[in-house]
Regions:
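ABC-family P-loop ATPase nucleotide-binding domain
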Residues: 1-18, 229-234
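ABC family nucleotide-binding domain
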Residues: 9-10, 15-222
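H-loop (His-switch) and adjacent beta-strand-loop-beta switch element
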Residues: 219-232
Length: 234
């Protein structure tokens, strides 16, 4: 049955991912099964090379599993073609990177509008107003017409979160989103992620910052491609 029915938004069933090496196959993920519910804030932790980023890439459809099944929002992601994946990802997954990756020659509002232009999800005459509303949500509306270089690191990360929300995706994936921010700014970013989950978004974050564990419904620890343990925090 190629569907998951209930409030589970992300479901991995016996997922493995291998990469060829000179000495044989290297398994970044090994027989991973995982269910994540709608509206939850989830942390993924583990040492470098443990499989954290591969897990995020599998959920986002950036990588396909070698074995197993991947469902996101009732779609069997691992069966989509490359062209189908590009369209699906643009509408269903918002990605926030550690280093923001805003285009430096575009203004903040132009950066936020880019995913809307790519997916053509909203009428062109509505996109600027939607982008302004998202910048208002992340408290940097007054920075809309500035270039990224004029903003602080925390403001740029807020802009990146607004961009990730551009097409109203149900899932936000963030890879070390506060790794280069001071503690106060990082706290404000986690506060924002928490607000997003209360509005129904599912947020999955790779993080090493244990001081923010109280924000998460669950902490998933990965070691050598295997889920080592899952700590329910609420």
């Amino acid at each position: 049955m190629d569907q998951v029915i209930n409030d589970t938004l992300v479901s991995l069933k016996k997922v493995s991912k291998s990469f060829p090496t000179a000495t044989g196959s290297f398994y970044a993920l090994k027989n991973v099964s995982l269910d994540i519910r709608k509206g939850h804030l989830i942390a993924v932790t583990g040492k470098s090379g443990s499989g954290k980023s591969t897990l995020l890439n599998i959920i986002a459809g950036i990588d396909k599993p070698s074995d197993g099944e991947v469902f996101v929002n009732n779609i069997r992601v691992d069966r989509l073609s490359e062209s189908e994946l590009a369209s699906w990802r643009g509408k269903n997954i918002g990605v926030v990177f550690q280093f923001f990756q805003l285009l430096p020659t575009l203004t903040i509002i132009e950066n936020v509008m880019l995913p809307m232009d790519f997916c053509n999800r909203y009428p062109r005459n509505e996109r600027r107003d939607r982008a302004l509303a998202l910048l208002d949500l992340v408290n940097i509306r007054d920075q809309a017409d500035k270039l990224p270089s004029a903003l602080s690191g925390g403001q740029q990360q807020r802009a990146a979160i607004a961009r990730a929300l551009a097409n109203d995706p149900p899932v936000i994936i963030a890879d070390e989103p506060t790794g280069n921010l001071d503690s106060h700014t990082a706290t404000s970013i986690f506060d924002l992620f928490s607000r997003l989950t209360r509005s129904g978004k599912t947020v999955i974050i790779v993080t090493h910052e244990k001081e923010f564990s109280s924000y998460f419904e669950r902490v998933i620890a990965i070691a050598d491609g295997v889920i080592e343990n899952q700590l329910v925090t609420v």
